[in-house]
Amino acid sequence: MKYGLCAVDLDGTLLGPTGAAHEADVVALKKLLARGVPVTIVTGRLYSGTRHVAEQLGLRGPVACVDGSHIVSTETHKTLHCHALAGERAIALRDAMAASRAATFVFAQDQVVYDERGTAYLGYVSTWSTSLVATGDSVSHPYWEEDAGVTAVVAVGDRTQIHAAVEAIAKTLGDHAQVAMFPAKNVDERWGMIVRAAGGDKGTALAYVADHYGVPMSEVVAIGDWINDLPMLRVAGRSFAMGHAPEPVRKVVTDRLDHTSLEGGGVARAVELAFGVRAK
């Protein structure tokens, strides 16, 4: 099989724990580009947290951010597609977050808006973007009422606060929102939550990018490591899971890598196996 597009996740896949890409993986992707094979990024990060990696690789084309909710051109830095919560749905989400009193981070217009309650968690949230904007009260920021809506909302709080928010969102937004609740990494005894508009994920975003390049999904290669990568790993013709990926991810892929993001080299190995391009 000849493959025509390579899609790579960032954190935990191309990027290591420090947020930097490993040299061998960068070299492999650049060699792939030099052969005329398009490469794209499909990440949970905002574009502001993705752009420097795209520039490091020399990407020219669409990249998918916020788990597929925001697709941006790396050439113009303009939005190609945005799947946001707007209007009454954004207001309903805002009200649910206000009632929960959890630290609320609003992802909108390629920024993360936070208030005093979120200051302690900036290190955690900066994984998505370092374009952080302080405000007096994040749940009363004008972004909630703008036509563009909000791309996503992340919240951090105790389990009771987050559970209350999840229940309120389910009651008021129902199938219009997708919600994930989880123990917050590196934040002791705190829970996290991310909310996005339903209907968009890494799989739909990858289909958009593949269509942009005129590549059938059967000829797309995807590389990821985490649960949010499942939608793109399921739809790609060939899919790779990093060595540290949890079993639900490893179950759905065509290939399981031994490499982890700690030592790097997983992306380079996937590129070699799928495209015959070696980093060295």
Language-model features: where?
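Residue-level signal for inorganic ion chemistry
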Residues: 32, 43, 67, 153, ...
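Short active-site oxyanion
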Residues: 36-40, 60-61, 151-152, 218-219, ...
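Mg2+-dependent phosphoryl-transfer enzymes with acidic/Ser/Thr/Gly-rich catalytic loops
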Residues: 1-5, 22, 195-280
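Hydrophobic packing residues within well-ordered alpha-helices of enzyme cores
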Residues: 25, 50-54, 165, 169, ...
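Asp-based phosphoryl-transfer active-site loop
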Residues: 2-18, 93, 233
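Conserved acidic, metal-coordinating active-site core of Asp-based
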Residues: 107-223, 229
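Active-site phosphate-binding/coordination module
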Residues: 18-127
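Short, structured coil segments at secondary-structure junctions
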Residues: 57-59, 66-67, 173-175, 235-236, ...
